[in-house]
Amino acid sequence: MSGKMNEWESLNTTLNRFTDNVVKFRRDSRTKALKCWRPIVDGIVDYVKRKDDRFHALSVFHKGSYYERSKVGEPDEFDLMLVMDNLELYDEPFEEDDGLSEPPIGFTTVMIDQGEEKPWKRDECVNRRGMLNATRVKAVFKRLADEAIQDMKSKGHWRNVTVKSGGTAVTLKISKDGREYSVDLTLGIKDNTWPEDAEEWKTRQRKGWPKRNLVHDIHEMGCHLVTKQPKGHSPIEQERGFLWCYSFSEAEKKLFLQGEQGEVNSCRRQVLRILKALREELELQPLKSYHLKTLLLYECESQPSARQWSKDALSERFLDLLKRLEKCLRSKECPHYFIKDLNLFEMLNPEKCDELADRVNKILKQPGQVLIRLIK
């Protein structure tokens, strides 16, 4: 047993060195990044609010790894959700026929209340039944963001800013002082009800993490709906634009920031940041940061005690998370943390999963040596 303890202590030391040399980013870099993009985002949001009354109630919700304090490397990527507060949903899902097929798991549709759909008829953002088209709403926002940037460029400002649209977000690319910052702006609607697709999460049998009161608070908080198209599903083509994806960014942020309350020396976020850094340094694509975050949340449920996440247990938790990752890659299954029937690995190439599993296994066999080679 003492031999195993010595191995863990040695790996702990190496993991902490790796964190200091590879994972952490400097505070001055963070301040410089925020000063660069914040005025631009504020300017775009203000312009959009003024120019189109459908977006008059936009509010900014900070999401993603930077705001969960799990960002690795330089602070050059940021995720913001722009919540359309005027479309906040309180009611249970509507019962009337919306004329659309059943949405794939993880997605839903939004019906604008009768009498409130008139402004959304512009740009064909709603159909004749009052169903809100996510794709068209996002396109309108991108057009307005483009206009805002061109307006500022005509006044001699923001010459270093470009905007593009892809996936869930409208992305700003900002170049300054030899660095490029990327800011994803995702349109969202607050849904104060908890989705039926995620009902299992509320009643899931747990060993103590997250605590019942936190589960209750998150359930009562609801979720967001964002403009994201489904992958791996084949809804009727003309219906794809009407699909809104459930987002649990607010719940995830709450889990990371409140799930550790009272755990002064927790290594939860450090383990995640190390895994993210390994993904980047070893080019373990197409694994995404979200996959690793999902696996960490499951590992937190499996190891619920604060003692199991103490700084002294860093090496054990690191190895356990790697084992969980290898197992999921072997089985080609990574269940969404909130919607367990949704497989996040569904679109990954099976052969690529096997290849990644083999690479993770090699790390497990010689974790210290792999980390030392990457320390600069």
UniProtKB/Swiss-Prot annotation:
Q: What does this protein do?
A: Nucleotidyltransferase that catalyzes the formation of cyclic UMP-AMP (3',3'-cUAMP) from ATP and UTP and plays a key role in innate immunity. Acts as a key sensor of double-stranded RNA (dsRNA), the presence of dsRNA in the cytoplasm being a danger signal that triggers the immune responses. Directly binds dsRNA, activating the nucleotidyltransferase activity, leading to synthesis of 3',3'-cUAMP, a second messenger that binds to and activates Sting, thereby triggering the immune response via activation of the NF-kappa-B transcription factor.
Which positions are annotated as binding Mg(2+)? 77, 79
Question: What InterPro entries does the annotation carry?
Answer: Mab-21-like_nuc_Trfase, Mab-21_HhH/H2TH-like, MAB21L/cGLR
Q: Name one GO biological process term.
A: innate immune response
Q: Which UniProt keywords apply?
A: ATP-binding, Immunity, Innate immunity, Magnesium, Manganese, Metal-binding, Nucleotide-binding, Nucleotidyltransferase, RNA-binding, Transferase
Gene Ontology molecular function: ATP binding; double-stranded RNA binding; metal ion binding; nucleotidyltransferase activity
Family annotation (PANTHER family): CELL FATE DETERMINING PROTEIN MAB21-RELATED (PTHR10656), PROTEIN MAB-21-RELATED (PTHR10656:SF70)
- Write out the similarity annotation: Belongs to the mab-21 family.
* Name assigned to this protein: Cyclic GMP-AMP synthase-like receptor 1
For this protein, the record's SMART domains field holds: Mab-21 (SM01265)
What cofactors are annotated for this protein? Answer: Mg(2+); Mn(2+)
Might you give the EC number(s) for this enzyme? 2.7.7.-
Name the reported effect of residue 79 to N.
Answer: Abolished nucleotidyltransferase activity
Q: Which reaction does it catalyse?
A: UTP + ATP = 3',3'-cUAMP + 2 diphosphate
